[in-house]
Amino acid sequence: AVDIPTIINVDRSYIRDIATRAVIDIENSNFDSAITKSRTLLEETFCYVIELKGEVPTTSGRIGDLYTQVKQLYNMHQSKDIDNRINSLLKGLEKIVSAIAEMRNNSSDAHGVGQKRYNIEAHHARLFVNSAATMADFILAVAMRKPSIEQ
């Protein structure tokens, strides 16, 4: 189990700050650190919105488990009652989480991987950072939305 610290506040400014620091890493050719920051940004955002619901984030250490918890708490499941384009985007979010987790686990500075390391390029690192920032912003927006009158 992994100890997940309580996040005091995650807001758009925080998301921009982490993303900016990751871009600086990219500009300094430190792609591994940028990928690690991408995952950290998602983990912290997921934990924050879980805690907003008064729940305790899972301590499994798997980012996919945190995202599953977020989806359950905020009813973010694909549905036949939702426009197919929205469902496609929600499915894409799953792939972002999975890809960032895999890349960080297999190619970043988080673990020694020896000769199996895949050296990514700057444009790939930017894709990871920008995808994580976009997803973090979306998750925050979902958590902060006002309930509609119908609910």
Residue ranges and their predicted role:
Residues 22-29, 52, 111-115, 143:
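Secondary-structure edge/capping motif, primarily at the C-terminal ends of alpha-helices
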Residues 19-23, 30-52, 129-137:
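Short, hydrophobic, well-ordered secondary-structure elements
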Residues 54-93:
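Short, charged amphipathic alpha-helical segments flanked by flexible coils
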Residues 89-149:
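Charge-enriched, short contiguous segments at helix-coil
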Residues 8, 28, 35, 60, ...:
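Conserved phosphate/pyrophosphate-binding and hydrolysis machinery centered on Walker-type P-loop NTPases
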